[in-house]
Regions:
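A generic "binding-loop/recognition-motif" signal
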Residues: 57, 76, 92, 115
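Short, positively charged
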Residues: 104-135, 139
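Short glycine-enriched loops at secondary-structure junctions
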Residues: 37-38, 75-77, 124-125
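Short, surface-exposed loop/turn microsegments at beta-strand edges and helix-strand junctions
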Residues: 21-29, 43-51, 61-65, 79-91, ...
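A short glycine-rich beta-alpha junction/loop motif
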Residues: 73, 87-94, 125-153
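Sequence-specific dsDNA recognition surfaces
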Residues: 6-22, 35-66
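Non-catalytic DNA-recognition/assembly elements of restriction-modification systems
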Residues: 1-15, 31, 138-175
């Protein structure tokens, strides 16, 4: 069945606590920016910066859950990762949460990654390319059944896991 990308996921905006308020920073909440994406790995395992509960409460940032996807929406458009544990994130990204019962979380990651070129072609902005919420309305995808999604995602995960192991071996050999 065909769906607009915006129909199969919740699109979550991020935010940044005021940097002029030191009490908002260096807390217990991981705060994700594009710098933290590691293209060699599917998941983000750590963030450069953290925020406090006060920083979280006094900004527009949201908390992503394990297995949510995240995509860079400004500047370096289309970088992707999955969230390995709950973390907040900045406004240069969108969190993408699979609609339960409609799309598998892992499948959504691969579906969006597969469509990054199309997303980039549909960016807006005069100075910087930007993915907006409307960008996700403009793209239609065919969704197989949940069972088929899980099978496809499992195969792709296995391949990604092997690539990650090979990258680690290569990094150890180079060291």
């Amino acid at each position: 069945m065909k769906y607009k990308l915006s129909e199969i996921m919740d699109i979550i905006g991020g935010g940044t606590p005021k940097t002029s308020k030191p009490e908002y920073w260096n807390g217990d909440i991981p705060w994700l920016s594009v710098k933290d994406f590691n293209n060699d790995y599917r998941y983000v395992y750590e963030t450069e910066k953290t925020i406090t509960q006060a920083g979280f409460d006094n900004s527009s940032t949201k908390l992503l859950k394990r297995n949510d996807s995240i995509i860079s929406a400004r500047g370096t458009v289309g970088e992707m990762a999955m969230i390995s544990y709950p973390m907040a994130f900045n406004q240069s990204c969108y969190g993408l949460r699979a609609k339960e019962g409609l799309v598998d979380e892992e499948y959504l990651y691969y579906l969006i990654k597969h469509n990054v070129v199309v997303l980039k072609k549909n960016t807006h902005g005069s100075v910087f390319d930007t993915i907006t919420r409307d960008t996700f309305d403009d793209i239609e995808v065919e969704l197989p059944s949940l069972v088929e999604q899980e099978i496809v995602a499992s195969i792709l995960q296995d391949l990604d896991d092997k690539i990650e192991v090979n990258n680690e071996i290569n990094n150890n050999l180079a060291a």
